[in-house]
Amino acid sequence: MENYRESFLRGLGEFRREGLPWWFGGDLDAAEQDFDAFVARKCADSNRRTEGFVPATHLWALAEEQFVGRISIRHELNDALRVEGGHLGYDTVPSFRGRGVATEMLRQALPVARALGLLEVLLTCDDTNTASIRVIEKNGASLRETRVLDAHRPLKRYYWITLSSQGYP
C-alpha cells in the first residue's frame, strides 16, 4: 500500500479543500502520520462491531497507479443507514470526476456485495445530486421511494439493486 500513499494523500487533500468530511471520521491526520496503520484500521472495519457502526468493506479505485476514489460496502443496515447512506457509499477524487469512475466503482462493487451475502442493496442520494443519480441508475437501480428528511435539505432518493447469483443485476 505504501506505493499508493502519495496519490491517496493528494486525493485526500482535494477532498479537504472541498470541505468534505468524507468517510474517515477522525482518521484524517492518522492517514498522513501512519499510512499503514490507517489502512490496517480500514481493513479491520469488515469485522467492526461497535456502537453505531456496521461491518464494512472498503475498496479503492485506482487508475494508472493513482488513487481516484473509494467505495464502501456496508454488510448490513442499521437504522441510521436505512435513512441515509445505505449499503454502498462512494466518493470520486474531485479531479477525476466526470470520467465514469463512480459508475465503474459501483459496477465492480456489486459482485463483492453479493459475495458478502447481500441479495439486495440500498443506495441513497440527494435529489439534487444529478451525478450520483446517473451513477446509480446506470447500474440498474430502481427508485423505490423519496422522502423529505428535513425542510432545509434536498429530497432524499432511495434506490435498490437486486443482486443475481453472479452479483450483478
Question: In which residue ranges do the predicted regions lie?
Answer:
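Charged catalytic carboxylate motif
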Residues: S7, M105, A131
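Conserved beta-strand-loop-alpha-helix junction that forms the acyl-donor binding cleft
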Residues: L123-I133
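GNAT-family acyltransferases
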Residues: M1-H87, P94, V112, H152-P169
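Conserved GNAT acetyl-CoA-binding A-motif
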Residues: A113-T124
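Conserved catalytic-core motifs of GNAT/GCN5-like acyltransferases
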Residues: T124-C125, G140-Y158
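Conserved acetyl-CoA-binding loop-helix of GNAT-fold acetyltransferases
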Residues: G89-T92, G98-A115, R134-K138
